[in-house]
Amino acid sequence: MVSLPRLYPILDPACFSDAAEMFAAAEDLAAAGVTLLQYRDKSGNARRMLDNARELKQRLGATVKLIMDDRADLCLAAQYDGLHVGQDDLPAESARRIIGPARWLGVSTHNTEQLAEAGKTSADYLAIGPIFATSSKADTDPVVGLEGLRRARELTSKPLVAIGGITRANARSVIEAGADAVAVISDLLRDPRKSAEEFLRVLG
């Protein structure tokens, strides 16, 4: 079973003014002690995504485990450590056949029914959310809440990542409700190094 770090930052180019700002933020996160990052780009520009992914790998690959969102082909091309798929992406077992047994595979879920189904796959970890209301995604699913997270914890022994509206103020309660890790986007954008250090301190 994989061992997830408490903090699971997600880097999305849409949150930055340009790629250089994103790369600088990634290096700040690594300097703060972050050991895992997901690169998520929904633009559909595969060439740019691959260039960015390779640059992140070159800058961080020695110290940070890198997860590619959605794109199994880019995961392999950029030599990333794992792939994360959502409910509208490749099915978990199809993704597994592409990336092989050694790379990590994560699956997003948005309710306990989806989580129970994902738990039957070869996914190494599962994500559930949104735990709280979030502004990072336009087409959000209904809020799961801490109670939904507790139910999810009862349904799986796989490592569980909570996502959606998680801040330094509520992160500890999310861990106490059963999450192994918290995925964060927005609350790391302002001063990434300081924010990550504060998250890591809160998460313990």
Language-model segments: which ranges?
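Conserved cofactor-binding/catalytic machinery of classical short-chain dehydrogenase/reductase
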Residues: 148
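A short, flexible beta-alpha/helix-coil linker loop
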Residues: 13-14, 132-134
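Conserved N-terminal beta1-alpha1 strand-loop-helix module at the mouth
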Residues: 1-90, 97-125, 141, 151, ...
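Internal alpha/beta core interface subdomains
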Residues: 179-181
